[in-house]
């Protein structure tokens, strides 16, 4: 994992704006044709990791369907929370929405800042801070993407998220 998008300031601003725990997260982003490997994983890592930033850990199962223009993935958490990821073909913007029981807040990712914000996290880590993303969270994100691939192959059936 190495997406810079979870560190985009707009995501934290949306989390702060909802005034409580995020119960629903919605993220959208690009789905191009990968030069190698799986396109949903190659491009989807950004949207999946943005969802993790909104929701935290605890994904239990994933359902995904390929609708042609987009792959739509739903992620169920064990406590009633859920997330939606739209991986949109030939669209190169990223953003989403955080929702609590009180309100919703939308965000767009400012692509002019994405590497700057990632480098700030890397610098802090090299200066002794804890890693900004744990190994467990990294694994869960990858497991969510693999579950999405399995779900698409299984006609949208729910696939459990493998745990580390």
Describe the role of every protein-language-model region:
Residues 86, 108, 161-162:
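Short linear motifs in exposed loops
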Residues 25-93, 136-143:
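Rossmann-like dinucleotide-binding domain that binds NAD(P)(H)
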Residues 79-81, 101-105, 157:
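Short acidic/polar mixed-charge low-complexity motifs
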Residues 1-37, 47:
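A contiguous active-site-proximal alpha/beta segment in oxidoreductase catalytic domains
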Residues 11, 47-48, 115, 119, ...:
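A general structural signal for well-ordered alpha-helical segments in protein cores
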